[in-house]
């Protein structure tokens, strides 16, 4: 494809939309730093010892202002960094420009095609003749997936000379992945094996990527150690819940200017993300209906005052539909045909397969009207009524808005820094096998503690007698591993 890597005056590679936005990006990064006490504390604690000196880190995670603070924390600790976004719509171009100019190699811009997206992912993994990265910060697992699929293809090629055939799958995106690997084989038939050999491990940010890791662990195909950052309490119970409580109405209002009060909102799924979305719609005055498969989550929703029904029960009644499941085929084209005129359909899960966009786009006679970027109206011919789809069924909170605020992302990204440090510091110890791990409770509590002062909190201290009475150390951790919060 006709894309070329550019270089800064210092020789750093990049590909972003507009480098003239770098100064604007820097101003917003400086604002975000004040709201990200955990990351700034990591710089203070670890910066002088440069623990990442010599480490090459590849990131595949939304290239936002908040991520810029994460990247500059990694570089402040001594790492070299190459970065791409994990979603075609989520990059904030001024953030990408500032980091590309000042700190790290960035390959990301808002509105990438899928082909451009995978080109950027490949560039972020490309560390030249020395192989790939030492560490990966992943979000959704696409960088991890590319390496695993590359290794598998190279093994097949070595055994029987088979080259990946993009036409062997009906999935348009996976066709691009196979095409990349096919082209790579022609240049270096051991490229992904070299990456696998060098890799110390990956830390994974989100629920969807974690599911992929556990699937690979179960089948014995996981190629390197992984730390599940998503299931740190200070990630899933804060970013997923309170972050989505903030970002869902933000995205809805920026995209449509709709008044949420008085509307009927349907939240598909009531995990941590769904809980945040349902709370947000309720707080804005909507009547909220939840769809669920899990009786425990369903009962939780009922206890919060939400109604539990199936999508089929409410498809013609509701005004706003939000998918939060991390599963596929949640809202299908037959559902969308039955919706009210101008019902809003959006997804806040990681991938784009919760909403049947392929079925919608290929529906006979359907007319697509682009209102503005990432806001489209699809009109059905038989009724001449339409629905409004946000971010083409992808992650609406970053496609239509700017995602989660800096403070809650500081909790998540402090976990990422700690996970990366843990993998790197233990790289020669044998502590981590080719399995999926979570960070220990005392580190989870440390992340929380780093964020209390910013909010004016003052913790009560246990006496020695009190600590002994409940069988915990005076300084924690205070809860057993199985405690659910």
Swiss-Prot record:
Pathway assignment: Amino-acid biosynthesis; L-homocysteine biosynthesis; L-homocysteine from S-adenosyl-L-homocysteine: step 1/1
Keyword Hydrolase: yes
Domain of life of the organism encoding this protein: Eukaryota
Cofactor: NAD(+)
Top EC class of this enzyme: hydrolase
EC number: 3.13.2.1
Note describing how the cofactor binds: Binds 1 NAD(+) per subunit.
HAMAP family: AdoHcyase
Role description: Adenosylhomocysteine is a competitive inhibitor of S-adenosyl-L-methionine-dependent methyl transferase reactions; therefore adenosylhomocysteinase may play a key role in the control of methylations via regulation of the intracellular concentration of adenosylhomocysteine.
Name of the featured protein: Adenosylhomocysteinase
Organism, scientific name: Mesembryanthemum crystallinum
């Amino acid at each position: 494809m006709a894309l070329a890597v550019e270089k800064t005056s210092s020789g750093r590679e990049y590909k972003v939309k507009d480098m003239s936005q770098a100064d604007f990006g820097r101003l917003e990064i400086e604002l975000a730093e004040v709201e990200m006490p955990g990351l700034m504390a990591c710089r203070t604690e670890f910066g002088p010892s440069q623990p990442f000196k010599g480490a090459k880190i590849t990131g595949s995670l939304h290239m936002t202002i908040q991520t810029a603070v994460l990247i500059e924390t990694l570089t402040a600790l001594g790492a070299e960094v190459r970065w791409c976004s994990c979603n075609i719509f989520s990059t904030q171009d001024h953030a990408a420009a500032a980091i590309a100019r000042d700190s790290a190699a960035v390959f990301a811009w808002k509105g990438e095609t899928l082909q451009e997206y995978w080109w950027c992912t490949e560039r972020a993994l490309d560390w030249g003749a020395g192989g790939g990265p030492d560490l990966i910060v992943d979000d959704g697992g696409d960088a991890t997936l590319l390496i695993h699929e590359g290794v598998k293809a190279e093994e097949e090629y070595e055994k029987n000379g088979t080259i990946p055939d993009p036409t062997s799958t009906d999935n348009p995106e996976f066709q691009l992945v196979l095409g990349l690997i096919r082209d790579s084989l022609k240049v270096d038939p051991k490229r992904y094996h070299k990456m696998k050999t060098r890799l110390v491990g990956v830390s994974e940010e989100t629920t969807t990527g974690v599911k992929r890791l556990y699937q690979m662990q179960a089948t014995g195909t996981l190629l390197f150690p992984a730390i599940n950052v998503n299931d740190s309490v200070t990630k899933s119970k804060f970013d997923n819940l309170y972050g989505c409580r903030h970002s869902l109405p933000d995205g809805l209002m920026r995209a449509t200017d709709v008044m949420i009060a008085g509307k009927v909102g349907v939240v598909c799924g009531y995990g941590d993300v769904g809980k945040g979305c349902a709370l947000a719609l309720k707080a804005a005055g909507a009547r909220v209906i939840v769809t669920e498969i899990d009786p425990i989550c369903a009962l939780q929703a009922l206890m919060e005052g939400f109604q539990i029904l199936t999508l089929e029960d409410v498809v013609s009644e509701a005004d706003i539909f939000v998918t939060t499941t991390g599963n596929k085929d949640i809202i299908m084209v037959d559902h969308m045909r039955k919706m009210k005129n101008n019902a809003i359909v959006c997804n806040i899960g990681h991938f784009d397969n919760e909403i049947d966009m392929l079925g919608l786009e290929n529906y006979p006679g359907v007319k697509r009207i682009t209102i503005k970027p990432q806001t489209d109206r699809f009109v059905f011919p038989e009724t001449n009524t339409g629905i409004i789809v946000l971010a083409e069924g992808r992650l609406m909170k970053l496609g239509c808005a700017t995602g989660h605020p800096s403070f809650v992302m500081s909790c998540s990204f402090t976990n990422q820094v700690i996970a990366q440090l843990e993998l790197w510091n233990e790289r020669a110890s044998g502590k981590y096998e080719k399995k999926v791990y979570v960070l220990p409770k005392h580190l989870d509590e440390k992340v929380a503690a780093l964020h209390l002062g910013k909010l004016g909190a003052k913790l009560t201290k246990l006496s020695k007698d009190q600590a002994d009475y409940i069988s915990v150390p005076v300084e924690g951790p205070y809860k057993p591993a199985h405690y659910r919060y």
